[in-house]
Curated annotation (Swiss-Prot):
This is UDP-N-acetylenolpyruvoylglucosamine reductase 1. InterPro entries: FAD-bd_PCMH (IPR016166), FAD-bd_PCMH-like_sf (IPR036318), FAD-bd_PCMH_sub1 (IPR016167), FAD-bd_PCMH_sub2 (IPR016169), MurB (IPR003170), MurB_C (IPR011601), MurB_C_sf (IPR036635), Oxid_FAD_bind_N (IPR006094). It is an enzyme of class 1 (oxidoreductase). Pfam families: FAD_binding_4, MurB_C. Pathway: Cell wall biogenesis; peptidoglycan biosynthesis. It comes from Bacillus anthracis. It is found in: Cytoplasm. The gene is murB1. Its main location: cytoplasm. Cell wall formation. The active site is at R174, S225 (proton donor), E295.
Amino acid sequence: MEQLVNELIQANVGRVLVDEPLARYTTMKIGGPADILIVPKRVAGIEKTLQLVKKYKTKWTVIGRGSNLLVSDLGIEGVVIRLGEGLDHLEVEKHRVRVGGGYPLIKLSTLLSRQGLAGLEFASGIPGSVGGAVYMNAGAHKSDISNILSKALILFEDGTIDWLTHGEMEFSYRTSVLQTKRPGIVLEAEFQLQIGERERIVSVMQKNKDYRRETQPWNHPCAGSVFRNPTPYFAGDLIEKAGLRGYQIGGAQISEMHGNFIINTGGASAQDVLSLIALIKQTIKDKFGVEMHTEVEIIGR
C-alpha cells in the first residue's frame, strides 16, 4: 500500500490522503477511514489513479458529495476517489447544458433556473453531485435525471472513456446501467432543457425547496431517503403507520418529520443506522407483508 501511495503522489493525481476519515465527506457525518483517499485535480488524475489501482490489484470506490451514502464504521478498503473540484466545469449553449460530474446539483439547478432554463426544478433540494445523480437516476417531485439527460461521458473500469446515450444508460427507478452491468465514473453529463419563463421556473424551484424544508429533516445530518418507495406504497407512510416514527438506536433516529429519513442526532455509528434499517425492514414485512429495499447506498468493509 505504501508503494501505491508513493506512486500516486509522484504521478500528481491530486490530493492523496492516507487513513482519511470519511465521516467529513458524507452528509450523514458517519464513516470510518479510507485506506487512500484521492481528490483528483482533473480527468487525467482519475485515469492515472485507475491505471495504478489496476497495476496493484487494489479495490477502488468512487464517491461524490457524499449524499445518499452510508459508509461502514470500518471504512473503505483500497482507494476512494472523491469527485469534486477537478470535475466542476459548466458549458451552457441555448438549452443544451454540458456539466462536469463533480458539479453540485443544487447549485446547477439554481443557476439554470435564473437563466430561464426549465427541467431541473426537481433537483432544487437534492444535495449531491451531477455524477452521483446520473449514476443513481436521482429524482424528486415526479421527475428525475432520466427526463433530461441526453448522454453521459463515462470512465469505465478498464480505463476506456466513452459516451453512453440515454438509451444505453438503461435508466429505471433510482438505477442505471452504471450500478449493474457497466460500472464506471460519470465524468460529464449533457442535459437537454427547455427555454421557459424565468419567473415561473424560479417560483417552482422555491416551492420545491419550501416543501423539502417543511417536510424533511435537513437541519440534521442525514443521507436523504433511506428506502425506495415499494409501489404502490410510499416508504415513509408505511414506516409511520408501523409506529416507528421517532424510534432511536444509539445516535441514529427515524425522523419525527418524515419516516423515510434516518438522522444522526450526534455520534451515531453506521451500525446504529444499519440496526434501524434492519428493524424497519422486519417490522414492515411483519405488519404489511411488504419487502423494503434501500435507496441509500451502503458501502465499506
